Amino acid sequence: QKDANFASGRNSIVHLFEWKWNDIADECERFLQPQGFGGVQISPPNEYLVADGRPWWERYQPVSYIINTRSGDESAFTDMTRRCNDAGVRIYVDAVINHMTGMNGVGTSGSSADHDGMNYPAVPYGSGDFHSPCEVNNYQDADNVRNCELVGLRDLNQGSDYVRGVLIDYMNHMIDLGVAGFRVDAAKHMSPGDLSVIFSGLKNLNTDYGFADGARPFIYQEVIDLGGEAISKNEYTGFGCVLEFQFGVSLGNAFQGGNQLKNLANWGPEWGLLEGLDAVVFVDNHDNQRTGGSQILTYKNPKPYKMAIAFMLAHPYGTTRIMSSFDFTDNDQGPPQDGSGNLISPGINDDNTCSNGYVCEHRWRQVYGMVGFRNAVEGTQVENWWSNDDNQIAFSRGSQGFVAFTNGGDLNQNLNTGLPAGTYCDVISGELSGGSCTGKSVTVGDNGSADISLGSAEDDGVLAIHVNAKL
């Protein structure tokens, strides 16, 4: 349950936040497949509360497990999983299984949500299926965090056989429809013992969608653990991966100048991070790009953000996830939508970028170029580490790829790239296209060394070359 089930030669999950199923299917075929992406994390596919103003967070208030949302119905969902899997791109469901709604109302499929009466007839859940109401207000008390209500959301009792059965059935239905795994929302707010039982009840992946016999769903759990609380991320690694929140905090701090890049030489568990095989890593996500504090880098701070993403994708640690946002000015703001609340599809520009209010970080050349880099260096380790003892670093991945960063001053060095002799295209400033480089090129000599130059005033403080972008 720690294997992402990527097709061969692919890596990275991109979170297509609030996209419609038919747009995701198109994106799998037209962009994610040719660029080597491994999979897509989708927004919650089950019925959720229709909230005033249609904020993004309404999707995290379930009303039922009917597959009918602003992103599409079950037939659109199945069309997406079929087309994406055919393209070698996996689908991971954002599974909201800790709670139901925080208010009364109606869901996206027309079902009623009786928050006050603890009654969700479309499931059905009644008052006996929830923990007694109390407020999550003490992160030094694990029982409070797990058995009370997070911001007023009715808290399901996963210790109940009935509730477990409903959740297992929902997740197994998703497996039947061809998904490769689940991001588990609010896992910290559920008991590891209960989650272990639920995940052990999941079917193997559906071989009709190209998965191997006996393949298990990939599980990666939201456990925000920045230290100092009663609950540890390590409680959840026995039955799945965990989203490593410390990763983005530490990288964001470094690339904003709060820590010298030379200190990244031992990046990984020595920094207090999970073991690599247990970790799904990211620079920002849909929550902390809004409320994560100044250390979290986002698309709004593009130069250091792209450098942090490049470091994440260049380094072997963890299973990587990339955020693909819609532009927002207000933290509650929902996705691009028309006057009736219908989602608007992203527009695709000639230069690969998006319009209609979508940021599409995954379509930035500096990002997809590094996904290609990660595929090219699969199976290698960090070698030829160099630093100027400050904010300039470089390293190779075996003899397959080489990357250099400056976060202070111009970098002009003759460095050992570890690569075979030849001329390579920098995949940050451009790419290999039609037999030539559209950006910078780097010539590696017979001894593996090359003159590397990276000016501090350039658009990007990173340069990357690999064997699949060689002239």
From Swiss-Prot:
Disulfide bonds join 28-84, 134-148, 354-360, 425-437. It is an enzyme of class 3 (hydrolase). Ca(2+) binds at residues 98, 146, 155, 189. Chloride binds at residues 183, 285, 321. Binds 1 Ca(2+) ion per subunit. Residues 326-346 are annotated as: Disordered. It catalyses: Endohydrolysis of (1->4)-alpha-D-glucosidic linkages in polysaccharides containing three or more (1->4)-alpha-linked D-glucose units. Keywords: Calcium, Carbohydrate metabolism, Chloride, Disulfide bond, Glycosidase, Hydrolase, Metal-binding, Pyrrolidone carboxylic acid. Its EC number is 3.2.1.1. Its cofactor is Ca(2+); chloride. The active site is at residues 185, 222. InterPro entries: A-amylase/branching_C (IPR006048), A-amylase_C (IPR031319), Alpha_amylase (IPR006046), Glyco_hydro_13_cat_dom (IPR006047), Glyco_hydro_b (IPR013780), Glycoside_hydrolase_SF (IPR017853). Residues 326-343 have a biased composition (Polar residues). The modification Pyrrolidone carboxylic acid is found at residue 1. The keyword Metal-binding applies. GO terms for biological process: carbohydrate catabolic process. GO terms for molecular function: alpha-amylase activity; calcium ion binding; chloride ion binding. The keyword Metal-binding applies. The record marks 287 as: Transition state stabilizer. Belongs to the glycosyl hydrolase 13 family. Monomer. This is Alpha-amylase. The lineage of its organism: Eukaryota, Metazoa, Ecdysozoa, Arthropoda, Hexapoda.
